[in-house]
């Protein structure tokens, strides 16, 4: 929505799925199907602002059925940081836990409470035992979010790294769609 506003793409509209789907990627496809069925009658072109998001290719199968495109990549982290940069990050430390601006802001609700760590602290060691580093991929320069991300890393017992990515390849992908 921010990129649409910044670029004056007034002919584009956005619909959002519930953010809690980050914790249950197996439910994303069903939610997309419902939204696509409703949108087909209203819009001549539809573009999905998701990467694969942990669905194991199921989003792609659904989108083939509806003849709809999506953002390239396996994760939003990949299109925010850029494909090559994301590959380098993973090569440097495969045990990286990524946060975006949205996930920093929603961490307590989506992760801490959503994964029940607040009531079962023993889950922290189970969920995060293979992670070594928290990488915050910032879309906007925001010192408060950087501080919050650093505090989250400390809370999780992880090293902290900040990388300003802006909107990365997301802007290019949307631009290509918006100008077609």
Predicted regions and their residues:
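Gly/Ser/Thr-rich loops at beta-strand to alpha-helix junctions
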Residues: 1, 21-22, 49-59, 77-79, ...
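N-terminal basic/disordered segments at the start of proteins
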Residues: 1-8
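Structural alpha-beta junctions
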Residues: 8-12, 41-42, 65-71, 151-164
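A short beta-strand-loop structural module common to alpha/beta enzyme folds
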Residues: 10-29, 162-166
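Short, well-structured alpha-helical segments in soluble
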Residues: 31-42
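Long, charge-dense
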Residues: 58-110
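A conserved mid-domain beta-alpha-beta active-site/ligand-binding segment of alpha/beta enzyme cores
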Residues: 90-145, 150
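C-terminal, charge/polar-rich interaction regions
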Residues: 138-180
